[in-house]
Amino acid sequence: MNPENRPIRSIFTVMSTAIRTLEKEGRLTMEKSYIPHGSTSVYEHSVKVAYTSLYFARRFRLNIDEKSLIRGALLHDYFLYDWHEKDKSHRLHGFYHPSTALRNAKEDFDLNPIEENMIVRHMFPLTPIPPRYKEAWILCLADKYCATIETLFPLLMWKVL
């Protein structure tokens, strides 16, 4: 069956497998301790962004690498610190956290070029270099969509257990 024809409910199966793998091999669960937008943890945000990215890709029948899309989306904010703390290294977080996330992800996982590009370019246009791959463009849109909802309308987003 073509990826675009798979039922949306299978997104949860694909995602849960990827999440378990990243939790086992790296520090993904540390993201539960940090709150980037509203009251949503980085972990919850990353799961929502991965789900939304895959939903968009399937809904619009885009020919993409689903595994890379999910992994890149789950790791896009893998910076592993609380950027709200009074610390000079956290200034200009929006500009610098993609490179920190990429460095941390490379320490814990073997990334392919699509995943690397997704992580380091997800803040476009705040960071001026655009994404190179379709998966990274999808992530940019899904991340901004989820962050906006989490910040302005937190009750509209579901809670990740």
Task: Say what each PLM segment does.
Residues 1-161:
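Metal-dependent phosphohydrolase cores
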